[in-house]
Amino acid sequence: MNDVTSCGALGNNRLAGQTCRLALRLDGTIGSKQISTDPDWMAQALSEAYSALVLASPNPRVGCVIVGGDGRLAGSGYTQRAGGPHAEVMALRDAALRGHSVEGATVYVTLEPCAHQGRTGPCCDALIKAGVAKVVAAVPDPNPLVSGQGFARLRAAGVSVEIGPGATASRELNLGFFSRMVRNIPWVRMKVAASLDGVTALQNGSSQWITG
């Protein structure tokens, strides 16, 4: 990973996203390049979300990075196991552990901050309480319990809200979640192994290895 341009274009590449995240320093640089654009920072948030790939279910895989007023990385995090902290709270905790203030900061998150009380409190309230100035989200949350309410509460508290880049990558990372919320059915993946002539066993009924 040699420059910020390649980092910002990561979007849909899981492995590249993880590599890019590991290369990001707390001063907001990768190599000698300074990260400064919304696509660059959202790429970092998406790479955090990929860290929750096998962890967050049945919750969506969400990543978050917080950028201080000086343009440097203040904190980052991703959604933990069901019932555990969401990405925004993890990023706030990370910033606190590092001794960074998030007052007036910009938050990049891959899904609209939640606005309902479940096993954890509303993430939008945590961001408001922390004093962040702006939230850039990749995509609205299709959950009927949220569905724009997170954005509304943030705006009502004086926090600037933008729908930023990364929508496609965020949805693709959470196909099952979006399918359940929007269509009320799970996203089913099926693999069929067949020979070139369309059969799955020999004529005598015995099976053979077709795929690994």
Model-derived regions, located:
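N-terminal beta-alpha supersecondary unit
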Residues: 64, 73-94
